[in-house]
């Protein structure tokens, strides 16, 4: 597909009811492609997803289409992603987006008190790496995962 990352994860109970899962259990190669947004339209990541499918179909000989070769994917196991959680609930201000580099100690988000409007807590990166997932909804609860970071292994 030529995407930057391939994430390997164990199926969750919800996955077992999907057509993709059923196909895989019956020996068919099936893939899922996810973009940056699932509840809104993100034009940039949607174009990237379309390009990746066209690239795959071209490589399989199903389609003739001229496009760039894409990335050599980094394979990541989901359990290797560092989950960053909130301490408090409230309004959420995201300061970093997927693909942004972060460093240990960077302030990457804030939780704002919904009644008084002050910053209740700051969300701090616990490692050097690249943001893989960033929460987008305007509110958060305490102890909620708001970022997943790919840890930087070396320079």
PLM regions: where:
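Structured catalytic-domain cores with a bias toward divalent-metal coordination
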Residues: 1-155
